[in-house]
């Protein structure tokens, strides 16, 4: 796909909006409708089709107060509440997880509020029921940095060598939030009560999406070890896979502007 094609609107099937691809592999911007229109059942059904096709959908220049954000998120299904309650930025809306490097006085702290998010991960893979999507909204963005990267896990599986596929098909990885936050990155944001709520959980390394029927890799930084393998061997395979499935050519890097909503 050429740069001209990436920047040109696509007429997009029978959708009541147009899409602009963000990257040759994944992601699109939706134009021609507002978020208020997108939540109507008839239009949202088409928005969801775009989400399934492109894996990422972006709305630019939108007002998204907490109440509206939670309401829009409910269109995708049950909205989960993050176990790290210290990041719940709105008392009335615990569904919203807030990340900021500003202190209580609004000044840059010089610290990243959640360093674990700097590594490749699948949001909420440490849950027994992992979510199908994450909704992000930008309020204040830095002049430099702060990008978010997304990798295509469909093609990650499709392009794996047959020898690697045979190693992982049918296997499960143990995802452990305490491992990824405490032992792996040297931070300990979880209280004892929070740790008890998120014990290690097993998920298939290769999952089939129920709506698209496509196979995808389900790994990332929260995956600690692999059932049926010795610990060190499983760790080595996870590290190898995490490198193989995130090559630059299949990664979209999003540079944020204020008032953007990404799902």
Predicted regions and their residues:
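Non-heme Fe(II) oxygenase catalytic core, chiefly the N-lobe of the double-stranded beta-helix
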Residues: 2-261
């Amino acid at each position: 796909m050429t740069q001209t094609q990436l920047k040109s609107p696509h007429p997009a099937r029978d959708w009541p909006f147009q899409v602009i691809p963000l990257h040759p592999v994944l992601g699109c911007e939706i134009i021609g409708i507002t978020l208020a229109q997108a939540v109507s059942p008839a239009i949202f059904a088409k928005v969801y089709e775009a989400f399934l096709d492109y894996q990422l959908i972006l709305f630019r220049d939108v007002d998204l107060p907490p109440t509206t954000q939670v309401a829009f998120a409910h269109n995708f299904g049950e909205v989960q509440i993050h176990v790290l309650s210290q990041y719940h930025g709105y008392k009335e809306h615990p569904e919203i997880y807030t990340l900021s490097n500003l202190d209580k006085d609004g000044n840059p702290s010089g610290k990243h509020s959640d360093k674990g998010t700097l590594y490749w991960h699948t949001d909420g893979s440490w849950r027994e029921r992992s979510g199908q999507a994450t909704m992000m909204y930008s309020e204040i963005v830095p002049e430099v940095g702060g990008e978010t990267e997304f990798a295509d896990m469909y093609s990650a599986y499709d392009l794996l060598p047959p020898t690697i596929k045979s190693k992982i098909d049918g296997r499960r990885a143990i995802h452990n939030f305490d491992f990824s936050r405490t032992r792996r990155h040297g931070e300990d944001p979880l209280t004892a009560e929070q740790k008890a709520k998120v014990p290690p959980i097993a998920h298939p390394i290769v999952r089939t999406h129920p709506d698209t029927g496509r196979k995808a890799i389900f790994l990332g930084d929260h995956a600690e070890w692999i059932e049926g393998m010795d610990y060190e061997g499983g760790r080595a395979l996870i590290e190898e896979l995490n490198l193989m499935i995130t090559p630059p050519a299949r990664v979209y890097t999003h540079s944020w502007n204020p008032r953007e909503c990404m799902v």
